[in-house]
Curated annotation (Swiss-Prot):
Family: Belongs to the ArgR family.
Predominant cellular place of this UniProt entry's protein: cytoplasm
Function statement: Regulates arginine biosynthesis genes.
Record keyword Acetylation present: no
Pfam families, alphabetized: Arg_repressor, Arg_repressor_C
Gene3D superfamilies found in the cross-reference section: 3.30.1360.40, Winged helix-like DNA-binding domain superfamily/Winged helix DNA-binding domain (1.10.10.10)
GO cellular component labels: cytoplasm
Matches recorded under NCBIfam families: argR_whole (TIGR01529), PRK05066.1 (NF003457)
Pathway recorded for this protein: Amino-acid biosynthesis; L-arginine biosynthesis [regulation]
Organism encoding this protein: Escherichia coli O6:H1 (strain CFT073 / ATCC 700928 / UPEC)
Assembly behavior: Homohexamer.
Protein name per UniProt: Arginine repressor
Gene Ontology biological process terms in this record: L-arginine biosynthetic process; protein complex oligomerization; regulation of arginine biosynthetic process
SUPFAM superfamilies (alphabetical): C-terminal domain of arginine repressor, Winged helix' DNA-binding domain
Length: 156
């Protein structure tokens, strides 16, 4: 098999494994790829691939920390499991603060930014697990807080 074709197969297998959301260590990913016949794979190659494809560690449905590929989701929607990544939503006089699972804040902020001013969102600032959201003109912080709660099916 040509080198580029072999590389394409490796990338395809790598992405398929991460979509399973069951690998909590790079060593587990290496072992799974070796089982599929990729004998030249090692931890450093897996580490580079994780970085290249923007993989993050987050909690799966079983609440286990696993590697996943948020970039594969495209523009997320609130009907997807992303709402499970939101842990807490609170506000003060200036901003709404959203706490997420580690590594999920930028993905959730992207969703909020895509909704924009029509939903009362002027903009977001995201770290690793925290998002600051400020209301657009004509919206109060409390109104924005309630809109975000509704988006993620959270209780008041």
């Amino acid at each position: 098999m040509r080198s580029s074709a072999k590389q394409e197969e490796l990338v395809k297998a790598f992405k398929a494994l991460l979509k399973e959301e069951k690998f909590s260590s790079q060593g587990e990913i290496v072992a799974a790829l070796q089982e599929q016949g990729f004998d030249n794979i090692n931890q450093s190659k897996v580490s580079r691939m994780l970085t290249k494809f923007g993989a993050v560690r987050t909690r799966n449905a079983k609440m286990e920390m696993v590697y996943c590929l948020p970039a594969e989701l495209g523009v997320p929607t609130t009907s997807s499991p992303l709402k499970n990544l939101v842990l807490d939503i609170d506000y003060n006089d200036a901003v709404v603060v959203i706490h997420t699972s580690p590594g999920a804040a930028q993905l959730i902020a992207r969703l909020l930014d895509s909704l924009g001013k029509a939903e009362g969102i002027l903009g977001t600032i995201a770290g690793d697990d925290t998002i600051f959201t400020t209301p657009a003109n004509g919206f109060t912080v409390k109104e924005l807080y309630e809109a975000i709660l509704e988006l993620f099916d959270q209780e008041l």
